[in-house]
C-alpha cells in the first residue's frame, strides 16, 4: 500500500518522526536526572530545549502523516490511523502546555507529570503506527519487492 507522501517509494512520515520522538523521550530523561542532580537547572534547561525541538519536529512530521492517513481507503486501518493521530495530537497539546509552563517558570511537578503522560501516549501511538505498517502494510510498496 503505497503512500502519497514519499520520496523514491520511501514514506516520509516514519523518516521524520524518529528524531522528535527521541528528543521528547530524552527530555523526560533529563527531567528525571534533574530530580537527583546537584545541578538540576542545567538538566531542566536541556529538557526544555529538547522538548521544544521535539515539539517542532513532531509538527513537521505530522504533515506527511496526515497526507498518508487521508489516502487510506480501508475503514479498519483508517480507524487505527485516526486513533494514532488523536493520541499524537493530545501528546503535542500536552507538550505545548508543558513548554508554556516552563517558560512561565512553573516549578511544581506539573511539567514532569505532563511529560510522563505524553511519553506514555507516544508509546501507545507508536504501537498503533507500527501496527499499521507491520500488520496491514501501510507505507509498504510491494510492487517493487524482489
Question: Which residues make up each language-model segment?
Answer:
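Polytopic transmembrane helical bundles with strong interfacial aromatic enrichment
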Residues: 1-146
Amino acid at each position: 500500500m503505497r503512500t502519497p507522501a514519499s520520496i523514491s517509494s520511501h514514506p516520509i512520515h516514519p523518516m521524520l518522526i524518529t528524531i522528535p520522538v527521541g528528543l521528547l523521550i530524552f527530555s523526560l530523561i533529563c527531567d528525571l536526572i534533574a530530580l537527583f542532580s546537584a545541578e538540576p537547572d542545567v538538566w531542566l534547561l536541556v529538557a526544555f530545549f529538547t522538548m521544544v525541538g521535539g515539539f517542532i519536529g513532531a509538527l513537521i512530521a505530522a504533515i506527511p502523516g496526515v497526507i498518508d492517513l487521508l489516502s487510506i481507503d480501508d475503514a479498519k486501518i483508517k480507524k487505527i490511523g485516526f486513533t494514532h493521530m488523536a493520541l499524537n495530537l493530545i501528546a503535542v497539546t500536552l507538550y505545548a502546555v508543558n513548554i508554556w509552563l516552563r517558560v512561565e517558570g512553573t516549578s511544581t511537578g506539573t511539567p514532569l507529570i505532563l511529560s510522563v503522560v505524553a511519553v506514555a501516549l507516544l508509546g501507545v501511538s507508536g504501537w498503533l503506527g507500527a501496527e499499521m505498517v507491520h500488520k496491514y502494510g501501510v507505507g509498504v510498496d510491494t510492487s517493487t519487492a524482489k
